[in-house]
Amino acid sequence: MNILHSTLSTWRDRLAPVSRTSTFRTTGQITPEEFVLAGDYLVYKFPTWAWADASSPAKRVSYLPPGKQFLVTRGVPCHRRLNENFAGDAGHEDEIVRDMLSGADADDGDGWLRTGGGRDLAEKQAERIKDVRTVDESGNMGEREDDEEDIPDMEDDDDDEEAIIREPAGKSTTQPIRTYNLYITYSNFYRTPRLYLSGYLSPSEPLPPHLMMEDIVGDYKDKTVTLEDFPWFDGGLKMASVHPCRHASVMKTLLDRADAALKIRRDKLKQAHSAAEANRINSERGLEGLVDETRGLSLNEQQGHAAGGDEWEVLQHDEEDQVAIRVDQYLVVFLKFIASVTPGIEHDFTMGV
């Protein structure tokens, strides 16, 4: 079934009509030219990412230039699996992430999942009780007290080494570090980026595809993540892929909220009565701060400083029509969203954070 789905998906992308009209602001979709523009920006800002070509000319798509068929970053660490121990809270109730711009009646589709958000406070308190230590009259903290049954017997020091039952290999609670190669491609059918993941247990030992699902948030793993052949490689290399069917709607929501947050900030700046108040407002990063430190690059804001320090940022008339996130910054925001799908993979490692 996966082979059939992968083949149909590849041919659907290659045969779909190519859009040359930008609908970035209205639909969250981008054209192939905008994908290249956003890829160039990602590579420029974060050199761990690079453009790559298909393994052979036959694997190339015509709507992207040779040498820029997809983006790749290699060796991204993944330290922990998404089980009940992940982040201390995984395995418990997930929650939908929203922001203050969403109303009380907002649909779950307006946000995205964050794993392990609903752990009961009483559970945490019960765990803390186990970490009680003693304090002497001088205020010095003592060592953790072992349970009575855990106090060692002095005779144990003479145990025969050969009689000790050791933990079998592979049963250690310390989880081995996995690494991932991440690939961003362009889906011509959905007109959005698409992420593929290829995992490794060691530099020379690929991670079996079904084990990659251990690093995907459960709700996505069950609905939108599939195992497919990577269309740009010969030989049928199987990877996990986040299906792009909802990428455009999620990106549109994020872009709209970033614009709304920027408008609120500008309105506050207009009403500011002092330089100190304006500086405080400027330091508050709303959703337009999704693009890391690129906000200053996108707004082209000018600042005036009088001799007495009474003037602050001046908003030019044409800046009212500017947006919080440009189309060339699209992939940076896209990766912030993807990080919620695979929270165990250190996406910030790829972005020099």
From Swiss-Prot:
Pfam family, one: Autophagy_act_C
Origin superkingdom: Eukaryota
Residue positions of the active site: 245
InterPro entries to which the protein is assigned, alphabetical: Atg3/Atg10
Subcellular location: Cytoplasm
Composition bias, Acidic residues: 144-156
Location (main, coarse): cytoplasm
Signal peptide as annotated in the record: none
Keyword Cytoplasm among record annotations: yes
Start and end residues of each stretch annotated as Disordered: 135-156
Region (Handle region): 249-329
PANTHER family: UBIQUITIN-LIKE-CONJUGATING ENZYME ATG3
Assembly with partners or alone: Monomer. Interacts with atg8 through an intermediate thioester bond through the C-terminal Gly of atg8. Also interacts with the 40 amino acid C-terminal region of the E1-like atg7 enzyme. Also interacts with the atg12-atg5 conjugate.
Domain remark text: The N-terminal region is involved in phosphatidylethanolamine-binding and is required for atg8-PE conjugation. The flexible region (FR) is required for atg7-binding.
The protein's name: Autophagy-related protein 3
Organism: Neosartorya fischeri (strain ATCC 1020 / DSM 3700 / CBS 544.65 / FGSC A1164 / JCM 1740 / NRRL 181 / WB 181) (Aspergillus fischerianus)
